[in-house]
Amino acid sequence: MESTEKLTDTNAILAYLYETFPLCFIAEGETKPLKIGLFQDLAERLADDSKVSKTQLRVALRRYTSSWRYLKCVKAGAQRVNLDGEPCGELEQEHIDHAQAMLKESQDKAKAKRAALAPKPAAKKAPKKVAVPQRAKTERPAKPAPKAAAPVVNYVQAQLTDLTKKQRVNVKLGMTPVAGVITDINKEDIHVQLDSGLTIKVRAEHILL
């Protein structure tokens, strides 16, 4: 009997939730507010699944609900959903206000962090006027060549015709691309085994090269 490898990476657990509960956990685009007490439903539904633990589920759920994408969906008129995507009541104003406050605080922290990491311009000092006797011109040593900048990875969206079995690709899952290998291509469905061991089924527009 084969033992099931337990998922420990939060991104891999989120990918598993996107695949298992696609009407509740949205991988891309606008999300939906989750039902209050959803963690308990999730723990019960996955009680017999040895891939994930309650602790890791809680961490993944916290990551999902604290993302800017999720906090932006908590707004007036939005309906909470259960694991099957069924409406479970409209949001209360108190919860909307709390989500917007969290979003603003998170965005302000990110802005402050970017500002702190930005290079500060050196203060300009007024040059002192000093009489310097003229000297014969001497050759200046050549300036060293500037160091090459580190390469920047620019992903491009794959076309179905570009994809083959055993090809290494990156799958768009939320904010962070996850690396994996194509195991099968069935018409428009592409099966990808992630480096974490999880196999998911996606379309070509979700694959980056």
From Swiss-Prot:
InterPro entries per UniProt: ProQ, ProQ/FinO, ProQ/FinO_sf, ProQ_C
Pfam family for this entry, one: ProQ_C
GO molecular function, one term: RNA strand annealing activity
Any GO CC annotation of this UniProt entry: cytosol
SMART domains documented for this protein: ProQ
GO BP annotations listed: post-transcriptional regulation of gene expression
Region (Disordered): 105-148
Locations listed in the record: Cytoplasm
Highest taxon, organism lineage: Bacteria
Keywords tagged on the record: Chaperone, Cytoplasm, RNA-binding
Function: RNA chaperone with significant RNA binding, RNA strand exchange and RNA duplexing activities.
Family: Belongs to the ProQ family.
Xref: PANTHER family: RNA CHAPERONE PROQ
Name this protein carries in UniProt: RNA chaperone ProQ
Organism: Shewanella baltica (strain OS223)
Top-level taxonomy: Bacteria, Pseudomonadati, Pseudomonadota, Gammaproteobacteria, Alteromonadales
Gene behind this protein: proQ
